[in-house]
Amino acid sequence: MPIQNSPYNAFATLLSSSGHPVSPAELHGLLLGRSCAGAGFEVDGWLVDAAELLEGEPQDNVRSALIGLQEMVKGELTSDDMTVVLLLPSDDAPLAERAAALGQWCQGFLAGFGLNSRDSSALSVEATEVLQDLAAIAQVQDALEESDDGESDYMEVMEYLRVAPLLLFTETNKTVAPAAKPSLH
């Protein structure tokens, strides 16, 4: 029996009933992407980017949900255990629906990262490869088939996507050590 009250389904219902033609996965990807690019966690900047994706100003209930989502992401990225929970359909949803949401999440992440990245040429080889992987995943969202192999592939990609933002966030939010002051002897 499908889980009707999953966070993904609740957010999807809220967005569609408010007239916003976007998936929760893409919205969550956008938020994580912008956060990992160094945009910070200021609510106003997030709401501006979200409104653009939503194709209009969000109503109060959607605005509250967006702020809550941002607080969740901030907590995930700044806590000691740094664990990212992806906003995707539940495991009992059809594989095609979950795979499409993974692709939408990647598209959102890349958009958020691209809009807010200060200097992508300064990224490490590993970080650049992560972004290339996300672009590839966004393109193959329809390639997973309903089978044990398809399910296994989906889980593998999902686990990768839980780790990828952490690498990018850590890299783009490195604190630069102050230069040592010359001592006067």
UniProtKB/Swiss-Prot annotation:
Q: Which GO terms describe its cellular component?
A: cytosol
Protein name (record): UPF0149 protein PFL_5969
Q: Which Pfam families match?
A: UPF0149
InterPro entries, from UniProt? YgfB-like, YgfB-like_sf
Residues passing through the membrane, by range:
none
Give the record's family classification. Answer: Belongs to the UPF0149 family.
Taxonomy, superkingdom: Bacteria
